[in-house]
Design a protein with these regions (language model features):
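Short connector loops at secondary-structure junctions
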Residues: 89, 117-137
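Short helix-loop capping/hinge segments that flank enzyme active sites or metal/cofactor-binding pockets
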Residues: 85, 89, 143-202
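Acyltransferase
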Residues: 100-126, 154-162, 168-173, 202
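A short helix-breaking turn/cap at a secondary-structure junction
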Residues: 23-106, 168-172
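Structural signature of FAD isoalloxazine-binding scaffolds in flavoprotein oxidoreductases
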Residues: 11-17
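Predominant activation on well-ordered alpha-helical scaffold segments within soluble catalytic domains
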Residues: 17, 23, 52-59, 109, ...
Length: 202
């Protein structure tokens, strides 16, 4: 099956269910037809019972799509396959943290060993700004949610809910069409995009 992942909506459910989920690299899989939430973060990816299953689905859905302006061309995608050293960076200080299950850490380290055995060089990288990543994620995601979902007004796009006036119809459509969490994200996104709060968040 397929899912969309903005901040973990493929990877985390897959982990909880004991299956494999892949958030694909930006631009490798078309997002045409996807209702955008956070455009710089949203990606479509497969779920499967094994890495091999996920790989097969990925081969089918990846590739350039002229209907998606963020979709990478085959020429650009091919550059990453050109010669040179095969290096993968792993932020080990982030992996070796309190609270990581021993079995998860064991499987992770075994995966690193398998990667090395295929000819890749694995380097420990220091991402010293990682502790700020969640704050940055929330600001970007909320702002993009507010912008992207503004079009779903029940007139041009989305669910249309009747009301006594056009204004009431607009409010009813937004209320009926979006759940509480989505409405919260829209509100917070509108807040962080307000000019008066620019210095506070950016």
């Amino acid at each position: 099956s397929l899912g969309s992942d903005t901040g973990g909506s493929i990877r985390q459910p897959a982990s909880f269910c004991g299956i494999v989920g892949l958030k694909t690299t930006y631009g490798n899989v078309s997002r045409f037809g996807l209702m955008a939430m956070g455009s710089s973060l949203d990606q479509i990816g497969p779920f499967g019972n094994s890495v091999e299953d996920v790989e097969e689905v990925y081969k089918l859905i990846s590739g350039h799509d002229p209907m998606d302006s963020t979709s990478l061309t085959e020429e650009v995608r091919g550059r990453s396959k050109e010669g040179g050293r095969k290096i993968i960076g792993v932020p080990m200080s982030f992996v070796n943290r309190e609270g990581v299950d021993d079995e998860v850490l064991k499987n992770f380290n075994e995966s690193i060993d398998k990667i090395k055995s295929t000819g890749y060089e694995v380097k420990d990288v220091d991402i010293n700004q990682l502790e700020k990543a969640l704050s940055v994620y929330y600001i970007l995601m909320f702002a993009e949610v507010s912008s992207n979902l503004a079009r779903y007004d029940g007139i041009r796009y989305g669910l249309s809910h009747p009301g006594e006036t056009s204004i009431k119809s607009y409010f009813e459509s937004r209320t009926a069409g979006f759940g509480a969490e989505v409405r919260r994200r829209i509100l917070l996104g509108t807040y962080v995009l307000s000019s008066g709060y620019y210095d506070a968040y950016y």
